[in-house]
Regions:
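Subtilisin-like serine protease catalytic core
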Residues: 231-241, 247-260, 268-318, 379-382, ...
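N-terminal export/assembly leaders
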Residues: 25-119, 172-179, 183
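Extracellular S/T/G-rich loop segment that most often corresponds to the catalytic His/Ser-adjacent loop
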Residues: 239, 243-247, 360, 375-443
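Bacterial N-terminal signal peptides
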Residues: 10-21
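C-terminal subdomain of the subtilisin-like protease fold in secreted/lumenal serine endopeptidases
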Residues: 328, 332-337, 346, 350-351, ...
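Protease zymogen maturation seam
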Residues: 122-148, 164-167, 174-180, 191, ...
Length: 481
């Protein structure tokens, strides 16, 4: 294989790019073991950043200051790189991506170095991943991640058929969620994915496709953890509670409680919390601190901490699906989700159903705007939706309400960063209570735990605040029936 003169095939390339809805100086697409690339005097580091963007680890000899020129159209990546990286050596590491259509090869890492100097390749500095959100061409859509779609295939579809479809529309498989059968597909920058979504809706190979919707964290919390008491490790064999949020700050002093942790946004990075919300929820869900009206139990619980939100407080549905799957594999039995949006996603609904079928008790905040509109994931039937009340048991003024709310709980707490009010706190309080209950009664089913909670509740105020309130008296009844 040889490099192709850009001028000779520029008209062909332009037609291809504009048909895909994009035109830029650098075009990149990687699908399995095939590469599409258009570059003209493009810094090598910029090309390698494109590999990083689709989840490939990159190691580069820092002495290499090279540019890339060439046109590659669906060629074997080994052959393509041999031509494009003439004068340098490279090493490719592969993994098998498991999805509903079987195992497919996915590039795991690429190393580029001076011949004979493989040890000189260093991890290329990686920019923090941020979910690039948009409201679409018309600006009226719920927020979604640019240039991405989530796709599920019909039974009987083969990988070859699906790959042929992706070739037609210029998509590349980035990841697959085995539990739900969903593929994350990425397209070249600037692609009109809304138009492609309509096209896929008419394709007989596709069962369902969605935009990769964005959810934002509620605001109001700050970071900083002054004067924290030392935290003792939980008892051996304790059942962990998972917090799917903005992560965990390593300076918060909660390390003795962490049984597992993962960054679903930047999987190669150590767990952190640029926002602070996740760390504050971890204090409450673990029992180190308690919502107002409760006393900290003293029986701290193990934590499974998953960072699913980026530095701007945004996440995607696919990241949330991956976070749920990790929580289950890490041994959590209760999952706290102190966030939500009004977007009802079929794929998220399926992910929630799968998690519940696997034995997870799912708890989510009803929201901090009293609209009465359903907020998801709280409104899914497999999730305990939690509204907020004040110290007097009356509705917190900004708590959402409605038929989807299952229970209410105190919405205020004094946290290391100061006082805070929100249904995030209510959700974390309920999650901790249920995790305590399960630790007292290992083996309890999801249905039995939910029934025990419902039976213990104090009366709820009228107006859509659930079947009852989890206050201090209700917590005593739950744990000491």
């Amino acid at each position: 294989m040889r490099k192709i003169d850009l001028k000779v095939l520029w008209s062909l390339l332009s037609a291809l790019f504009f048909a895909a809805g994009t035109a830029s100086a650098l075009y990149f697409r990687l699908d399995g073991d095939r590469l599409w690339l258009q570059a003209e005097q493009t810094p090598l580091v910029d090309v390698l950043e494109q590999f990083s963007r689709v989840g490939v680890g990159v190691r580069l000899d820092p002495s290499i200051q090279s540019t890339v020129t060439g046109l590659i159209l669906g060629q074997d990546i080994d052959e393509a790189l041999e031509a494009l990286l003439e004068g340098y050596d490279y090493l490719l590491t592969w993994k098998m991506l498991r999805g509903p259509l079987g195992r497919v090869p996915k590039l795991k890492e690429i190393q580029v170095y001076v011949p004979g100097s493989a040890a000189s390749a260093r991890p290329m500095p990686k920019k923090s991943t941020r979910f690039d959100a948009t409201r679409g061409v018309a600006g009226t859509s719920p927020e979604f991640v640019k240039d991405e779609l989530l796709v599920g295939t019909r039974p009987g579809t083969t990988y070859a058929q699906f790959q042929g479809l992706l070739d037609q529309i210029g998509g590349m498989i980035v990841e697959a969620d085995a539990a739900t059968g969903v593929y994350l597909i990425r397209f070249p920058t600037g692609t009109n994915v809304e138009a492609l979504l309509r096209q896929l809706g008419r394709n007989p190979l596709i069962a369902h496709a969605e935009l990769n919707y964005v959810t934002r964290l509620p605001g109001g919390l700050s970071t900083g953890f002054p004067s924290l008491p030392a935290v003792s490790p939980p008892a051996d064999g304790s059942i962990p509670v998972a917090v799917l949020d903005s992560g965990l700050d390593p300076s918060a002093g909660l390390a003795p409680l962490v049984s597992a942790g993962w960054d679903a946004v930047d999987p190669e990075r150590n767990l952190s919390d640029p926002d602070g919300h996740g760390t504050q929820m971890a204090f409450l869900a673990s029992g180190v601190l308690a919502a107002d009206g409760f006393s900290a139990s003293g029986a701290t619980l193990p934590l499974v901490s998953v960072r699913a939100f980026d530095e701007d407080g945004k996440t995607s549905n696919f990241a949330l699906m991956q976070a749920l799957a990790y929580a289950e594999k890490a041994g959590a039995k209760v999952v706290n989700m102190s966030w939500g949006s009004e977007v009802d996603s079929e794929f998220m609904r399926t992910a929630i159903q799968v998690a519940a079928q696997q034995g997870l008790i799912l708890v989510a905040a009803a929201g901090n705007e009293p609209t009465g509109n359903a907020v998801y994931p709280a409104a899914y039937s497999d999730v305990i939706a939690v509204g907020g009340v004040g110290a007097d048991g009356q509705p917190w003024a900004n708590s959402n309400h409605g038929a989807f709310v299952d229970v209410s709980a105190p919405a205020s707490a004094t946290l290391p960063s100061g006082s805070y009010v929100g249904t995030s706190i209510s959700s974390a309080a309920v999650a901790h209570a249920l995790a305590q209950y399960l630790n007292q009664r290992p083996g309890t089913t999801v249905a039995a735990a939910r029934a025990a909670l419902a039976a213990a509740l104090s009366p709820a105020p009228a107006g859509g605040y659930g079947a009852g309130v989890l206050d201090a008296a209700a917590l005593r009844r739950l744990l000491n029936p």
